[in-house]
Curated annotation (Swiss-Prot):
GO terms for cellular component: nucleosome; nucleus. This is Probable histone H2A.6. SMART domains: H2A. Core component of nucleosome. Nucleosomes wrap and compact DNA into chromatin, limiting DNA accessibility to the cellular machineries which require DNA as a template. Histones thereby play a central role in transcription regulation, DNA repair, DNA replication and chromosomal stability. DNA accessibility is regulated via a complex set of post-translational modifications of histones, also called histone code, and nucleosome remodeling. InterPro entries: Histone-fold, Histone_H2A, Histone_H2A/H2B/H3, Histone_H2A_C, Histone_H2A_CS. It comes from Oryza sativa subsp. japonica (Rice).
Length: 156
């Protein structure tokens, strides 16, 4: 230990040099390579009192999961918008994306999306039968001729 003038120990530089340039702070989101805010999610986890203590990896993991889900929904919604020849994603496109995807549909089954509407769905029982439709057309035409009133038959 170095003892300076007056008998006091000289302070040693710990961490960085005393006169050196200060490094620019790097956020945890940048370190993890994420777009979602790791620090904010960590703060929400602590404030929400979900547990007495929150580990350092928990907000990073949660931010990564949320970012992945958001990217997945946005990609599918963008595809739905393109299918409808639109350049802007609207709530309807988000709903179509979620409900048409099996896993996302199961995850968000109880979620209502405002202005999303519903999936187009007609019960097959209510649809007209195609085979019977073709067979009925000639029969209807012959019935129409036979069902004409006597006055109309006399005119033709």
């Amino acid at each position: 230990m170095d003892v300076g003038v007056g008998g006091k120990a000289a302070k040693k530089a710990v961490g960085r040099k005393l006169g050196g340039p200060k490094k620019k702070p790097v956020s945890r989101s940048v370190k993890a390579g994420l777009q979602f805010p790791v620090g904010r999610i960590g703060r929400y986890l602590k404030k929400g009192r979900y547990a007495q203590r929150v580990g350092t990896g928990a907000p990073v993991y949660l931010a990564a999961v949320l970012e992945y889900l958001a990217a997945e929904v946005l990609e599918l919604a963008g595809n739905a918008a393109r299918d409808n020849k639109k350049n802007r994603i609207i709530p309807r496109h988000v709903l179509l994306a979620i409900r048409n995807d099996e896993e996302l549909g199961k995850l968000l089954a109880g979620v209502t999306i405002a202005h999303g509407g519903v999936l187009p769905n007609i019960n097959p029982v209510l649809l007209p039968k195609k085979t019977a439709e073709k067979a009925d057309k000639p029969a209807k035409a012959s019935k129409d001729k036979a069902a004409k009133s006597p006055k109309k038959q006399a005119r033709s």
